[in-house]
Amino acid sequence: MPFKMSSKAQTIKIFNLRSDTNEFIGAGDAYIPPHTGLPANCTDIAPPDIPSSHIAVFDAETQTWNLKEDHRGETVYDTTTGNQMYISEPGPLPENVTSVSPGGGYKKWDSKAKAWVNDEGAEVAARLREAEGTKSRLLQMASGKIAPLQDAVDLGIATDDEKAQLDEWKKYRVLVNRVDTSNPDWPEQPV
C-alpha cells in the first residue's frame, strides 16, 4: 500500500533506491515527521524476491518493481573480435559475447561448439605480415649500407675492401628481395 501523509509522526519500513538507476539497495526504518512525505530515493513498497544476477528496479510512475538482469562486474569476450569487455551497466548481456576467454593466440569463436578454436587463417596472415615487415626492414637496412659504399665507388675513391663490401651487400639485398615471405628463409648478412 502506498505511503499516506499523516498528521502524526511515524516510523515505517522503507526500501532505498540508488539515485541513478532506481535499483533497490537496501531496507531500513525511517522516521517520518508529521505532514511530510517519504525521504528522497526510497519507497514503502517492498521489492519482489530478487534472483541472482538480477536487480529490482522501482518505476516511480507506475509504483511497481521490475526485475532486470544484472551482469555488472563481469568480464565477457566479444565472439567476433575476441576483445575483452567489462560490463558496467545493468541489463542483459550484449549479443555475441561469451564468458569464456579466447586464451591468447589466434582464435575464432565456433558458434556450434560454443568454444574458441584455432584460427589457422589468421595465424598464417599474421606470420605473412610479420615476414613482409622483416623483409622491408632488411631491404631498408641493406640499402642504407649500400648507399655510402656506392658513393665511394661512384666518386672513384673506394678501397678494395669497400668494393668487396658493396658487392656483398648488393648480393644480400637481391637475396632478401627474392625471399618468399610465405615460407621465409633469410640469407646471412654480410660481415
Swiss-Prot record:
Belongs to the tfa family. The gene is ycdD. Disulfide bonds: none annotated. This is Tail fiber assembly protein homolog from lambdoid prophage Fels-1. Pfam families: Caudo_TAP.
